């Protein structure tokens, strides 16, 4: 390789680096070298927060040119479709043919056109799922959506559950197991990852499979997919249980205090978080003179009265309270 060739290559590489730097944008202040840069959206400027130098001006705004002040206005002014979502088997990128049988002006279409649209609609539904894998995914995601709606969990949980199920399908973990079982386990795993307090009992109530199968499948997919799950904090169940029992914030605060104090003593290890929270609420209701029976608390927490009695005795002994 000649000297002039090497020189040209070095110049080309340097030019490419400059272009990459310009594409990435300014990373530090050319005046003081600080990386504490603040973007001023109203002036379209990039300003150094340390020395005040305007590093960039007249920046391009990638947002829409229109303004909206609420969700309805944003929907009306937006000229794009819905974002992609993991909760649909085709990620929401399909075309849906409306069933209204009306034209763009709201007028009814002819019978010939109606027949044509009916055929198109039927074929559209058929080609949406090209193989058994997609049909499996479509059914599973609809099950996740149904159960999530019944449980009243946020949309983020549905997205996470859908991603977990897609991973399980890709790793061929569905073989030998029911679609409903894996879908329910994915939803339970998503609730735990997102910190949404839902017990296996609550999940099994809205599912079409038994609790034992859900637990068994959940342990299998979490191990195979390497899902890192933190232990469920019993305090996350306290607000919902107290609300259903119509207990005051004083009881809620006392229950949290009991959980914190007794957990530090090591009582929580190996215990069911729902039963532990239920016992703390029962103890707090007695201490705050808002007594609820063990049966009432057990019904709300979906645990047995025996569990509440056992956890209650352990907790009051650890707190040094004589019941």
From Swiss-Prot:
SUPFAM superfamilies: Cyclin-like, Zinc beta-ribbon. Pfam families: TFIIB (PF00382), Zn_Ribbon_TF (PF08271). Residues 1-35 are annotated as: Disordered. The keyword Membrane does not apply. Sequence repeats lie at residues 142-225, 236-317. A zinc finger (TFIIB-type) spans 24-56. One of its GO terms (molecular function) is DNA-binding transcription factor activity. GO terms for biological process: DNA-templated transcription initiation; transcription preinitiation complex assembly. Stabilizes TBP binding to an archaeal box-A promoter. Also responsible for recruiting RNA polymerase II to the pre-initiation complex (DNA-TBP-TFIIB). This is Transcription initiation factor IIB 7. The gene is tfbG.
């Amino acid at each position: 390789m000649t000297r002039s060739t090497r020189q040209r290559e070095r110049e080309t590489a340097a030019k490419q680096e400059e272009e990459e730097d310009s594409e990435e944008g300014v990373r530090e202040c050319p005046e003081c070298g600080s990386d504490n840069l603040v973007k001023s959206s109203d002036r379209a400027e990039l300003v150094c927060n340390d020395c005040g130098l305007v590093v960039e001006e007249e920046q391009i705004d990638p947002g829409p040119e229109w303004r909206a002040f609420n969700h309805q206005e944003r929907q009306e002014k937006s000229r794009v479709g819905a974002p992609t979502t993991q909760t649909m088997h085709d990620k929401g990128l399909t075309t849906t043919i409306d069933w209204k049988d009306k034209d763009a002006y709201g007028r009814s279409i002819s019978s010939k056109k109606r027949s044509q649209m009916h055929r198109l609609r039927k074929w559209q539904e058929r080609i949406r799922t090209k193989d058994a894998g997609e049909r499996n995914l479509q059914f599973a995601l609809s099950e996740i959506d149904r159960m999530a709606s019944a449980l009243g969990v946020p949309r983020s949980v549905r997205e996470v559950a859908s991603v977990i199920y897609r991973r399980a399908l890709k790793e061929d973990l569905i073989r030998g197991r029911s679609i409903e079982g894996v879908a329910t386990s994915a939803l339970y795993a998503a609730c735990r990852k997102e910190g949404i307090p839902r017990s296996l009992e609550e999940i099994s109530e809205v599912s079409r499979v038994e609790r034992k199968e859900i637990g068994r499948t959940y342990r299998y997919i979490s191990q195979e997919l390497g899902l890192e799950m933190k232990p469920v904090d019993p305090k996350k169940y306290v607000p919902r249980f107290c609300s259903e029992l119509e207990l005051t914030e004083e009881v809620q605060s006392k229950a949290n205090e009991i959980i914190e104090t007794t957990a530090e003593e090591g009582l929580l290890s190996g215990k069911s978080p729902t039963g532990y929270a239920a016992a703390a609420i029962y103890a707090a209701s007695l201490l705050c003179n808002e007594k609820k029976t063990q049966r009432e608390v057990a019904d709300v927490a979906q645990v047995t009265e025996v569990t509440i009695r056992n956890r209650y005795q352990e907790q009051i002994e650890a707190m040094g309270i004589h019941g």
